[in-house]
Amino acid sequence: MKTKLFINNAWIDSSDQQTFERIHPVSSDVVTESANATVTDAIKAAQAAEEAFKTWKAVGPSERRRLLLKVADVMESKTPKFIEVMAMEVGASALWAGFNVHASANVFREAASLATQIQGETIPTDKAETLSMTLRQPVGPILSIVPWNGTAVLAARAIAYPLVCGNTVVFKGSEFSPATHALITQCVQEAGLPAGVLNYLNSSPDRSPEIADALISAKEIRRINFTGSTRVGSIIAQKAAQHLKRCLLELGGKSPLIVLDDADIDAAVKAAVFGSFLFQGQICMSTERLIVDEKIADEFVAKFVEKTKRLSAGDPCVTGDCIIGPMVSPNSGERINGLFKDAIDKGAKVVCGGLAQGALMPATILDHVKSDMRIYDEETFGPITVVIRCKGEAEAVRIANDSVYGLSSGVFGRDINRALRVGMSIEYGSVHINGSTVQNEAQAPYGGTKNTGYGRFDGRAVIDEFTEIKWLTIEPFEQQYPF
């Protein structure tokens, strides 16, 4: 597959004609050859977005809604293509890729529904014969930097919400998924959005830092949203702060699933398997910690292992219905093996699976994990999860909160009041009582606490993220002033 940059409604090569390759993590075959953007291209994209903003901000809500609904329809019509491309680029199963397209279409439809919900309010004033009000206005060109793992849906939210609020977008895709991100851009183009409203860039890892620097500092860019690692997100936040530009950051996660002693064990096991191993555990809200009451831990682990061993593994390009595919890079396997070996050396027990071989790793469960093990609090981002045994509700809460991250979580227990008490006590942006940690609905705010970042995608929260609030008064000509 070959892809280009998309600037001002034209698919173009990079200004220096250079390309980079996305290599399959197992076969080492070249999957995609992508145009390799330069700083010159990045500035050109920002300028196109600024020029388009002059007219796009004045487009009425009904027209913005119509166009975003059209994008959703176009995306759904290309579902087979998305499944094919995501399997080749990021090892996505048909299940994960199909969900991504469905969720992405929902994001564009939810965004479309917000077109007439961007509202101000009237404010009581002490000034006679004066009307005081607030308005919500678009902020200008938005820089959206998107990762590879939720390949379609994370791009959709970074595009749709700024657009419905009247902004334009410079979309920086991931070097791991250039064809998928170009396909999303193509959907927006086919829906008929005006030139410059969406501009797409991609670049090799060695060029990406200078391109990000150039865009963050560009006078045309007004706000930034980034989904990715906490390390990179922190760098972006610091650079944005130098230019007094607001960020929305959705970063790392170490999501816990708490299983209380009165839980429905079979239901908890189903949620644990789904949350731990969907897309090889490479989801920011994947279940990386099972915090299980010691009274039921043996039964839970036995059933968890039994169900996990039934998961099918393979190459989605060959076996589309497999659940466990390759990780995005052989480097992932090397990193996880380091965490695995450290845990075993310190007393953890392997109850399912084993070491990774390059980008391939079986669904793996470690039991009896303790706080002195690196895997206790380091993000794994692969098909491995851990069981941490606890004594009672209070210790479960303490362990859940013993993390620098705070994205998603789950609590299983039959006593709903008790489960709710636990849910209110843990420091996470999302808490699901008797549900998996892996959940997302376009109408519900999504984000986290602590090192997971700040700001929220989805739901009405995006209106604050992608608009400016303005105080406006209409006053009588004749007024009394003190001098």
From Swiss-Prot:
Coiled-coil region(s): none
Keywords, sorted A to Z: Aromatic hydrocarbons catabolism, NAD, Oxidoreductase, Plasmid
SUPFAM superfamilies per the UniProt record, alphabetical: ALDH-like
Protein name per Swiss-Prot or TrEMBL: Salicylaldehyde dehydrogenase
Organism: Pseudomonas sp. (strain C18)
Family statement drawn from the similarity comment of this UniProt entry: Belongs to the aldehyde dehydrogenase family.
Other observations noted: Encoded on an unnamed 75 kb plasmid.
Active site: residue positions: E250, C284
A GO BP entry: catabolic process
PANTHER family in UniProt: BENZALDEHYDE DEHYDROGENASE YFMT (PTHR42986:SF1)
